[in-house]
Amino acid sequence: MKKFLLCLFWVTFLLSPCLLQAQEDAARSLDALQKKYSGLKDYTVDVNVHFDVEGFKAPDMQAKLYCKPPDRMKIESKRIFFLPKEGGTFNPFMFNKEDFEVRFLERLTYDGRNAVKLKLTPKKRKLNAQDFILTVDTDRHLIREMNTSSFDGREVKASIEYGHFGDFDLPTRIELHLDVQFSESMEIRDFGPSAQPPKGVTGRVDITYSNYSVNSGLSDQIFNKTDSSNLRGGS
């Protein structure tokens, strides 16, 4: 028994520095992600959403997305538009290490590049709090996969492809695999006849992004729901 306890002590002692290093690497990965996009002030992009979802038949949907980090977003569409909140939009600033307990899971190779898998758990648990598992390309500091899960069993997996626009790598395609409550997880913009989405969905959603305009000086007015006439401000 003494030999077993002694062995256990030495294994723990030897592994502790490795675990500590892994946790530090996890925090650095999030820091690098924030730093990479620190100069991103705003972007505008055309969005196309294609649904392959059980029990939900809809044509492809188009909209224009306005985003001003860290947390301002507006969707403009001439018709009804559904966009999944979990993984449907790109916001690298949502993963602030001060807001999460960050746990290192593993190192891996993703598309031939070095990557790490991290688990992020919110420090403040709210009713709609979600856990995240991120696969981060550590060579280019990009989130390649994002899995979200919530207390009520909703799960979304997002795979992200990027292109280079201005000085930034921004998504060109996000593929979502859903097992969620549709009405709770979708941004809905109704500019045509009224319609109701189904209550629950399982399936795949392909979101493609094109015609980026980056750091164009979007006015704060555009995010005012009562006044969207002035789309841009500044030079």
Indicate where each model-derived feature is located.
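Positively charged n-region of N-terminal signal peptides that target proteins for export
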Residues: 1-7
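Bacterial N-terminal signal peptides
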Residues: 7-17
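N-terminal leader/targeting segments and the immediate start of mature chains
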Residues: 18-48, 52-54, 233-235
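A short, amphipathic edge element
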Residues: 26-28, 94-104, 154-157, 204-207
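Extended lipid/amphipathic-ligand handling interfaces
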Residues: 32, 63-68, 158-166
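Edge/loop elements at the starts and ends of beta-strands within beta-rich repeat scaffolds
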Residues: 36-43, 56, 111-113, 139, ...
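An acidic-aromatic
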Residues: 52-111
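Gly/Pro-enriched, hydrophobic low-complexity segments
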Residues: 114-224
